[in-house]
Amino acid sequence: MKKKTILLAIIPALAFLLLSCTNYSDDNKQETDKPKENEPQDITPDDTPNDDSNNDGNTTPVDNNPVDNNPKEDKLNPMDEPYIGRQYYLNHIGDIYSAWGTYRGKGITIAVIDAGFNPNHEDFYYADGTSKVSDKSASFTTTSSGTTTSVGVDKVVNMSESHGTFCAGVAAAAINGKGVVGIAPEATLLLLKTDLKPKSIAKAFKYAADNGAKVVTISIGSYYTYEGDLVNDGSDLGTVFDEPVKYCYDRNIPVISAGGNGGQSQPTEFTFPGCVDNVIGVGGLAANSSTNIWEGSSYNSSPQYQFIDVFAPADMMFGCCHYDGKLYDGGWNGTSFASPIVAGLAALYFEKNPNNTSIQFENNLYNSCRALASQNGVQSNQLGHGRVDVTKLLNLTSSGSVTARFKSDWSDCYAYVWNSVTGTHQNSWPGTKLSKNNGVFSVNVDSSTYDSIIFTQSNSGPKTPDLLIASFINGNVYDLTSPISEQGMDFKVGVYH
């Protein structure tokens, strides 16, 4: 919907990596070298020790939460989680504590695509002892013979590293009095383990869409420059990922991806699949900040390459793990952990708005963000729509006044408000007739039901006009210039509010 990949050069090797860094305890400390070009970057410990690294469950957390949750009597209190005071990032995404009083992701499934998990982590069980991990969880492996799928919770186990477990916990760790709380603590987890090969990841996307996921988060990717790339078998990554991502999007399943840890040292690099059309790319905020970007986060290096859409906390993260006998750890950083935050917000959104489309979620997400100011040589227009805000996201109005303008060579044109899922329209068919060259379409839109405005030609053969569309909703102006290249295609623009 917003990103275009440019594929111009062949790169002989493809390496997908986990988009995070970690701080382990001193006795595990290793040196971290910059990965060689086109080689995978392992999750290696950072040289900097931190106070959160030796969490054996005996440390009393400091309550850093300024907001009283006041949950309903029939709900468990997230403030009773032993380590919620170390989840500082919860204070920098809007008032999540109040949101939990009503919405916790109940009935929503979050698919997490990664390199493996500990599906039996104690925070993946509810207080009554039932697991929040879907029995449809699966693993995907690609060889020269093709990609195979193995279904079952036991198939997703990877105890050699904690990246996937940490990401899943950020999104949806349960409220059970054990440790931490996820953004959507009552959401179901569909855990999808891959061997980090592109075709395995692509198959995981489609599997998620076909097996109950309402949102997909992925925190693995591959860095490349704007010259483009090809995978080893000669097919480009755009081809590998475009179709399965669109498969999700067309079924109203948003795909959310870590935007990359390029930072200012790699300003011209982006990541697959985060740069693919219809993927929401997430950049990272600095520790304990609502306004400063994390120094390691990728950002949009120029106006024509807008791959990072929103920002969420990504630094000094505390969450679920499994190594050295530990179940929780702190000091982790990376856009890997910003992506599941946004996925958790999506779960809350769809619990409130179960009939809304992926277009509506994306538009509501962007319009609810808080703009980020220019900083450290990075301009505000390089920082996407800004920092996510759960309060605004869940309290946007469900209707708004829309005015759209167009210029074209059409002798006649009709405009109508449309629901892309049900195929229904708000105003009577064929819609409102617009005059040539300066058509104006104004209507009050119930955006809880309708997600698009359609401009279509009638009573004459198909043409290929250039349309200049501006959509005004609740005082916001959106420049939506788009030439039509396919004959007979309707021009569709998402409804913002």
Predicted segments, located by residue:
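Extracellular S/T/G-rich loop segment that most often corresponds to the catalytic His/Ser-adjacent loop
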Residues: 114, 271-351, 355
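Bacterial Sec-dependent N-terminal signal peptides
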Residues: 17-78, 195
